[in-house]
């Protein structure tokens, strides 16, 4: 109706040249697993708060109808894994998610303990398990382009308006993915 793909919609086929590609919007959330090995799940939020960090999601992101955000994240992972597993093996995937799919990409130098609100370790290997060509995300507001195991990981957020150089044209903030 509005021309927007959601994670529940059939995956769109990329109309450009080359191999068959599917545009895969996902909605995977976070489960506090992007934390150091010595920090338990039960202590994760307190660990982050000890450095003066607390995500607004703790107060504003209700997990309903799930009991916790962890449960909601697990349900989204399970549903998405099932859909990805059902795709033909020769279809290349362009995955778009709000959060990075790997813990090593959830690095915020000024607020390192914010990582617990940046994704889930359950997706760390998805770029190898599935036929992923590129992963697009934006939660960190730290634009970057990395290649891991031959897969591009593109942090493409525009950031907040205060982070923009108003003299720079919008086109300078954009980059081709395919």
Regions found by a protein language model. Name each.
Residues 107-108, 113-116, 120-133, 140-178:
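Binuclear metal-dependent phosphoesterase catalytic core
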Residues 5-15, 57-63, 129-135, 169-175:
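Low-complexity, flexible helical/coil segments
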Residues 22-94, 101-110:
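Active-site-proximal loop/helix segment associated with metal-binding centers of metalloenzymes
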Residues 4-7, 11-25, 30, 91-92, ...:
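Beta-strand-turn-beta hairpins that frame and shape the catalytic cleft
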Residues 11-12, 28-29, 100, 133, ...:
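Catalytic metal-binding/acid-base residues of hydrolase active sites
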Residues 2-5, 80-92, 125-133:
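A structural motif corresponding to the C-terminal end of an alpha-helix
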Residues 23, 98, 139, 153:
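Divalent metal-coordination and catalytic microenvironments
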């Amino acid at each position: 109706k509005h021309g927007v793909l959601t994670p529940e919609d059939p995956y769109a086929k990329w109309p450009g040249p080359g191999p068959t590609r599917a545009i895969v919007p996902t909605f995977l959330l976070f489960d506090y697993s992007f934390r150091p090995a010595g920090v338990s799940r039960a202590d994760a939020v307190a660990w982050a708060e000890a450095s003066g960090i607390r995500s607004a999601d703790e107060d504003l992101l209700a997990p309903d109808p799930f009991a916790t955000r962890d449960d909601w994240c697990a349900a989204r992972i399970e549903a998405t894994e099932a859909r990805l597993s059902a795709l033909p093996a020769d279809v290349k995937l362009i995955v778009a998610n709000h959060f990075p799919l790997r813990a090593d990409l959830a690095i915020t130098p000024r607020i390192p303990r914010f990582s617990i609100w940046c994704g889930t370790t359950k997706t760390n290997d998805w770029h190898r398990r599935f036929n992923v060509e590129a992963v697009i995300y934006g939660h960190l507001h730290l634009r970057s382009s990395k290649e891991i195991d031959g897969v591009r990981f593109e942090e493409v957020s525009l950031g907040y308006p205060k982070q923009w150089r108003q003299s720079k044209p919008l086109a300078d903030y954009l980059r081709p993915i395919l």
